[in-house]
């Protein structure tokens, strides 16, 4: 499969013609390169899968240590269907997603939609705190407790980053992609060239290299122009890691 080219809009490199070809290869039916029709095709194919799924898997934009609440911000209804329709709901996120108190989330709510999609708030703002009820028999309105689980990625690599005076601010990144949108190198070559296997752009190269694999760290030196535009857009943008950094040894 393909890899994301942008943090907020991972498939932005696909044209409507590309999407039509992709849908045709999957559905084996003709597809016009018209966005409204492609949306209907996507809904027709995906809706039965949502309704029949036994488990939904979500990622968190924010997690609140005070209450155990996980929060997802999205403009797509499928995010809420994944969380509410299946009997089992699994959240997977890193420890860097935690804030201490519920009152702290307002800062992320203010910045993330504005920087990511130029909105005051996303269309869907979902809070999940523990297990809820799920309808298991619609005809009789029978409900059972949902299975709710969280996998929190607390890895040695993440701990090293958090303990580092040089690079701990990298976890201030909320994946809004503001730095990508102003980056001359990213706009020229795209996220498949400038970025890691998971996250894109300069900040994505750092995140992937420090938290998972150093394979992509060379792309920073190749693409970074040290123009400071990313730093101006968001304080989490950092200078290139030194070759002798203990995190890269």
Map each language-model feature to its residues:
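Ferredoxin-type iron-sulfur electron-transfer modules in oxidoreductases and energy-metabolism complexes
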Residues: 138-170, 180-181, 186-249
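The feature marks the mature, well-folded catalytic cores of soluble enzymes
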Residues: 1-165
């Amino acid at each position: 499969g393909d890899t994301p080219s942008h943090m907020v809009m991972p498939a932005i490199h696909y044209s409507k013609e590309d999407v039509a070809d992709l849908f045709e290869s999957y559905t084996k039916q003709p597809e016009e390169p018209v966005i409204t029709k492609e949306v209907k095709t996507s809904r027709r194919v995906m809706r039965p899968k949502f309704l029949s799924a036994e488990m939904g898997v979500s990622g968190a934009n924010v997690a609140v240590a005070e209450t155990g609440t996980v929060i997802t911000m999205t403009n797509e209804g499928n995010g809420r269907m994944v969380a509410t329709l299946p009997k089992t709901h699994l959240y997977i996120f890193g420890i860097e997603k935690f804030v201490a108190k519920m009152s702290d989330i307002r800062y992320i709510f203010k910045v993330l939609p504005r920087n990511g999609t130029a909105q005051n708030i996303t269309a869907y703002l979902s809070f999940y705190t523990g297990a809820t009820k799920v309808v298991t028999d619609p005809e009789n309105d029978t409900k059972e407790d949902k299975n709710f689980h969280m996998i929190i990625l607390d890895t040695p690599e993440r701990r090293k980053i958090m303990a580092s005076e040089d690079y701990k601010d990298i976890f201030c990144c909320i994946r809004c992609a503001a730095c990508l949108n102003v980056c001359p190198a990213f706009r020229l070559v795209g996220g498949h060239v400038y970025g890691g296997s998971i996250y894109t752009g300069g900040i994505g190269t750092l995140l992937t290299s420090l938290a998972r694999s150093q394979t992509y760290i060379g792309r920073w030196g190749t693409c970074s122009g040290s123009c400071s535009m990313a730093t101006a857009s968001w304080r989490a943008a950092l200078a290139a890691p030194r070759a002798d950094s203990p995190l890269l040894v």
